[in-house]
């Protein structure tokens, strides 16, 4: 009996362990290092951290100057994600520095950064590495037309309209009419970096400067060029989000009412900060906008398996399964702008794929050109991971027995040849049998 019980227990334990490993493979480890300026931030930003924990993230909280900090051990990353809520740090503790963090991003890690007007050099340098330039220390975004009614007088408690958000629901969530509260430092994007995303910009009347000084020089950021929140998706699909405001993620801003100081402005009982912060965290930590390639098939129409080599002008069918991560599960992706290219150095065929159930497929005729080709799907859309699939095939010319017996375009030449033969035959008959009569006759 004991043996049977122990055997059953072992099977159950193995089943639970395998199920947990499968779930972990789908959701990712979710191990996240959170670096704080001080431990109090864990309490003042508890709603945001609680939402991450409820979604399965394993959060490790440490102060940014902890001497035991480490991102890499024995060549392996110890965490999947990094949260930097330590804007004023001047030197990270342990073996973490800007070079380590950039290596973490190059290795596929995701980073969420929150700055403030008291920004230190490490965050400024990290921003420069990612194509983001922060304004000087002690500066703030100022807007004399779009500030909250509770602003103390510096006009730095900005009310950002949802119209200033990036038009990408995958990144910023569903459209809403609730404005966002912002108090912090301004940023500008490197115009030579095409990977930077302007997630939330200031209004046309905003600028970044010292709030306690008269303006004596042109501000660092002005109008729509003033970035409040910026993002980056690297070419390896690693994601980084920079917020110029640490207060943006705070409980106080999540639960605050908001109303512009302008006469007749509408009052909202709650800001849109919490919804936007949750959407941003889902995107930056790859809970949203993640695509993958499933089964890829190609074969001549009417057959089910690919040949060793296709023949020019064959009618072929190509199919690909594309899935998206949603709620921790892979579900069929719904897109109407996915293209297939048939490439030999340059594309010879470019056509849209049509969705057929959970699969995208298309039929097309191969070009009358032989060589080594690729079926290529290169899908790169705002907010989604870069999707790439390439399948190499050979295309050969027609065999000798595959050519047409008579080519329609050559009919005039056939007619001239046969007419010449017929004319020669008639001429021969006439010449041989139609002799002139002799005089004796």
From Swiss-Prot:
Residue intervals annotated with topology Cytoplasmic: 432-441
Any one GO cellular component localisation term in the record: oligosaccharyltransferase complex
Localization of this protein: Endoplasmic reticulum membrane
Keywords: Endoplasmic reticulum, Membrane, Signal, Transmembrane, Transmembrane helix
GO biological process, one term: protein N-linked glycosylation via asparagine
Transmembrane segments: 411-431
Pathway terms, separated by semicolons: Protein modification; protein glycosylation
Superkingdom, taxonomy of origin: Eukaryota
InterPro entries: DDOST_48_kDa_subunit, OST48_MD, OST48_N
Side of membrane Lumenal, spans: 29-410
Signal peptide: 1-28
Membrane topology designation: Single-pass type I membrane protein
Subunit: Component of the oligosaccharyltransferase (OST) complex.
Family label: Belongs to the DDOST 48 kDa subunit family.
Function comment: Subunit of the oligosaccharyl transferase (OST) complex that catalyzes the initial transfer of a defined glycan (Glc(3)Man(9)GlcNAc(2) in eukaryotes) from the lipid carrier dolichol-pyrophosphate to an asparagine residue within an Asn-X-Ser/Thr consensus motif in nascent polypeptide chains, the first step in protein N-glycosylation. N-glycosylation occurs cotranslationally and the complex associates with the Sec61 complex at the channel-forming translocon complex that mediates protein translocation across the endoplasmic reticulum (ER). All subunits are required for a maximal enzyme activity.
Name the UniProt record assigns to this protein: Dolichyl-diphosphooligosaccharide--protein glycosyltransferase 48 kDa subunit
Native species: Danio rerio (Zebrafish)
